[in-house]
Design a protein with these regions (language model features):
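Structural preference for beta-rich elements and adjacent junctions enriched in aromatics
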Residues: 1-139
Length: 139
């Protein structure tokens, strides 16, 4: 799956993409294993069954490279677009026409404090609720 985010620098502020994928379009009210969170900033971060997995047990879980997916990082001040590539094998999906996925996206300034902003698609999407994500159908 290839995603391209344009306009990731806005008013001199960098915005970092997050991708939420429900590979089987289960539309669950809460996260389950097999539902993925991908974040691209100065490192690549991922969560299988949970979002916002930056650290676990005090250990940084983000890195410059991750198995099964990639994103252009670290961004520079001149970065205008961010590419994200996720293999279907990472998602546990055989890419066949008609296969349905749940998808949502966010752009965030990733400050980690009260000034943090997030912009979602769809606008009604909620990070913690995969049933608010939109349907995508492979062709």
């Amino acid at each position: 799956m290839y995603l391209l985010f344009h306009g990731v620098t806005h008013g001199g502020e960098s915005l970092f993409p997050e991708v939420f994928v429900d590979p089987e379009y289960r539309r669950t009210a809460h996260w389950q294993k097999g539902q993925w969170w991908f974040h691209v900033s100065y490192n690549l971060c991922e969560g299988n069954g949970e979002p916002n997995v930056y650290t676990k047990g005090g250990v940084l879980k983000c890195s410059r490279e991750k198995e099964g997916w990639a994103g252009n990082n670290p961004p520079s001040k001149d970065t205008r677009a961010t590419e994200v590539k996720v293999s279907f094998s990472k998602l546990g999906v055989k890419p066949e026409a008609g296969h349905q996925l749940g998808l949502a996206f966010a752009l965030t300034n990733a400050t980690g404090d009260a000034t943090q902003k997030s912009f979602f698609w769809p606008r009604s999407a909620e990070v913690q609720a995969p049933n608010t994500w939109r349907q995508a159908v492979l062709q």
